[in-house]
Amino acid sequence: IDTELSKLAPLPVSEMITYSTLIDGEVKKGEKDKSVVGAPLAMPAGRQVGAHNEKDKYTRVLVTGAAKTLVQKYVDVFKIAKLNLQAIDTESFALIRALIGKDKGAIMILDFGSHRTNLFVVEKGIPFVARSINIGGETVTRRIADQMKINEVDAERTKRDLGIAGNGSVGGLPKILEPIMQPIVNEIRFAFQLYANMELTEIKHVEKIILTGGSSHLPHVPEYLAETINLNVYRGDPWARVVYPKDLTTVLEEIGPRMAVAVGLAMREME
């Protein structure tokens, strides 16, 4: 595994903490989640069962890893805080637990955050494509500030008001957001192409997009993406697998997009 990983890893394998598990065949319950940073790869299986099927020549392995120096920084922070560090996990696995669960389809998670937007194409619970683009909520704030000639504090307040006012309203994507959304649309299409052309994936066609992240509350973003890409787009609900008092529904719906990663991390040992 290390030999194959060395062809893909950005660092020497000796400088990384890695964990691997089989994608095909028997996998212990919850084993695939005990990981740091993930990327599927194909390993020669050593024997060929049925020459008619190219996939039979390989064993698919999910390898996860991170630089030892990065992991040590997190360990040191938790020691200073006098907290017991249980595990280090990736955003992708946390989001899969919180938003996809046991759905075995091909799904894209679009995490529209403050500084960047992350895209993950997930097939049968395994992330096969991970992309990131430096566009996020702060990009929207700066554009509002430039367009309206106001400071960024007021622009941030305007953005939040825009999100609140947009909930349940009719109409299309605000014009101010269109130039920001176009690079994200381009990245989505590129991720779709990467996934479709991967040799060892099975479904090939993404069935839906789940939208999450603190900036996903912006008005009409799901509708705009659905119309532009011709695919079903939903805002993710990280509370769908969580039992909570009904009188908290309004508050949880408001903070849900920002809590998906945290909820997924909390669900790590509950599967």
Question: Where are the regions that the model predicts?
Answer:
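Glycine-rich phosphate-binding loop plus the immediately following alpha-helix
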Residues: 69-92, 126-164, 168
